Structures are given as structure tokens and as C-alpha cells.
């Protein structure tokens, strides 16, 4: 998407299909606040945009590209394991966009795969019963884009409630500007931040 107007049209289209602001934010890789801002047509007024859209379609269209990114993520995980002397039992992918990367990392590292689906209304999410369980596992959490960190925080909380231990979060792109969440280290392949502006 090349313009704010196009983002607005896409957000409105998704809203008209019944998606919540949170679901739209996940689909468009924007914060919930930015989606609310777009849908309220605040962008028509003077003012600076307070978010960065991150699109990775060029990576996602081919499995070979996803596995290339997963190799980098696996290398980061091994680096953290060695640096901080911890072991990993399982790789957790946050639905939807964290799952392809987590699947490939799980394969490359020969670790169990856990799939987590966050609840769009910020309630407790759930772990898919078709994949590995959480209890007693040391877990690396993988997602594509972290805007505010709320989804990661909820995932860490839910992992803990289920008897697991989150030992690391690995993100394709982070807008957060933090090195840990709830005491769990966060590593990202890319970090974004807005500089300057009005």
C-alpha cells in the first residue's frame, strides 16, 4: 500500500467485513491506535502519522524465503542459548503470521512446535491441541511484527499460566524499542522507530 488513503480504504473494507480493530491491526501490521485513527478519518486533519507500516509479503510468498528468515532466527536463538546458558524445548508461533516462521525454526532446530492463538478482545488466548503442549517446557516465542508488545505480553502470561516458561521472544520486526518484556529477552531481526516529526 502506497498511501494513507489506501490504508484507510483497506481498514474500512476489513471493518465492513466484521473484523475488530485488533484483527485489522494484525492484518495490516499497524497498532490498534493507528487503525482507530485511520477509521476515524483523523488523517484528513493536519498532524503527523504515529506508526510505521511493516509489510513482508515479499518474504511470505515463497517457503524458501520463510526458511531463509527462519535460519537467521534459529541462529539468534542459538546465540542467546549460548550467551545466557539456557535450553529450549519448544518453539511457539503466534497465529497467524508467527506460525510459518515458528514452523521452520522448529524444523531447523528439531524442537517441538506450539501454536498459540491470542484472543482478539485481549482475553486469555488458547494453545492449539493439534500441536505440542506447554506444561514444563522452555519456550521461544516467535511472531512477525511487535507494535506495542501487548500480544507478546499476553502470550508470556498464558505460557506461564499453563506451566511453561518463556525464555526468549524472536520477532521479525519490532516497533517497541525494548530488550525484554515481563523479564523475557526480546530479539528482533529489524527494529523500527520514528525520528523527527512535528
From Swiss-Prot:
A Pfam family matched in the record: Pribosyltran
Superkingdom, taxonomy of origin: Archaea
GO MF annotation: an example: DNA binding
Matches recorded under SUPFAM superfamilies: PRTase-like
GO terms under biological process: pyrimidine nucleobase biosynthetic process; regulation of gene expression; UMP biosynthetic process
Keywords: DNA-binding, Transcription, Transcription regulation
Domain notes: Contains an N-terminal DNA-binding winged helix-turn-helix domain and a C-terminal regulatory domain (or effector binding domain) resembling phosphoribosyltransferase (PRT) domain.
Family recorded in the similarity comment: Belongs to the purine/pyrimidine phosphoribosyltransferase family. GfcR subfamily.
Name of this protein: Transcriptional regulator GfcR
Higher taxonomy: Archaea, Methanobacteriati, Thermoplasmatota, Thermoplasmata, Thermoplasmatales
Amino acid at each position: 500500500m502506497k498511501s494513507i488513503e489506501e490504508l484507510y480504504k483497506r481498514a474500512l473494507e476489513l471493518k465492513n467485513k466484521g473484523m475488530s480493530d485488533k484483527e485489522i491491526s494484525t492484518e495490516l501490521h499497524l497498532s490498534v491506535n493507528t487503525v482507530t485513527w485511520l477509521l476515524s478519518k483523523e488523517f484528513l486533519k493536519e498532524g503527523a502519522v504515529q506508526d510505521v507500516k511493516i509489510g513482508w509479503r515479499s518474504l511470505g510468498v515463497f517457503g524458501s524465503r520463510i526458511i531463509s528468515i527462519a535460519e537467521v532466527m534459529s541462529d539468534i536463538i542459538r546465540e542467546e542459548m549460548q550467551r545466557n546458558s539456557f535450553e529450549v524445548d519448544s518453539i511457539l508461533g503466534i497465529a497467524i503470521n508467527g506460525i510459518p516462521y515458528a514452523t521452520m525454526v522448529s524444523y531447523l532446530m528439531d524442537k517441538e512446535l506450539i501454536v498459540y492463538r491470542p484472543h482478539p478482545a485481549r482475553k486469555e488466548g488458547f494453545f492449539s491441541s493439534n500441536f505440542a503442549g506447554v506444561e514444563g517446557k522452555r519456550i521461544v516465542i516467535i511472531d512477525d511484527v511487535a507494535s506495542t508488545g501487548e500480544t507478546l505480553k499476553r502470550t508470556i502470561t498464558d505460557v506461564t499460566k499453563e506451566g511453561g516458561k518463556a525464555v526468549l521472544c524472536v520477532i521479525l520486526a519490532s516497533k517497541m524499542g525494548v530488550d525484554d518484556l515481563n523479564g523475557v529477552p526480546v530479539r528482533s531481526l529489524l527494529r523500527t522507530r520514528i525520528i523527527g516529526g512535528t
